[in-house]
Amino acid sequence: MTVELRADLYKACLRISPRHADYATLSVEDGFDWSSLSRCSFGSLYLVVFRSVRRPEVDLDVLLYHDDRAYEEALASGGLLRYFKGQANERGECLSFCLWETREQAIQAADAASHRSATRISAQMYLSYVLERYWIQKLGEKLIFDRI
């Protein structure tokens, strides 16, 4: 991918935003405006969605500390196009995601020390959580979300 195409893709990814206030309970395709990607050139992108229900007594300072360290490490590792940090709704439901250039880059970041540290505190922070993984591909200007 040329520098110009990569810069366009990165800028387009920054424009991905929630389409609805209840995005955490919707499919990732419906909850967000992905239209900026339809104007970009790419083969496929790798999306990791983290859906969670926070414990009522969660220590937000601890959660944010671990989240921020994992984000910094992921950013430094390369390939992270967009990190969306969701806010929990009144029921504690939250959706965050990382959009990557490649699956390999996502796996590398997940194996980094700060990310492993964040996963170790998951049981203390969440009543439940699930990871969803997708390939995002283009068919003309249409985006295809293929859950894997």
Predicted features, each with a name:
Residues 35-38, 68-71, 88, 94, ...:
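Short, flexible coil/linker segments at or flanking structured domains
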Residues 75, 79, 88, 111-114, ...:
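Short amphipathic alpha-helices and their capping/turn residues within compact interaction modules
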Residues 97, 104, 108-148:
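Alpha-helical oligomerization segments
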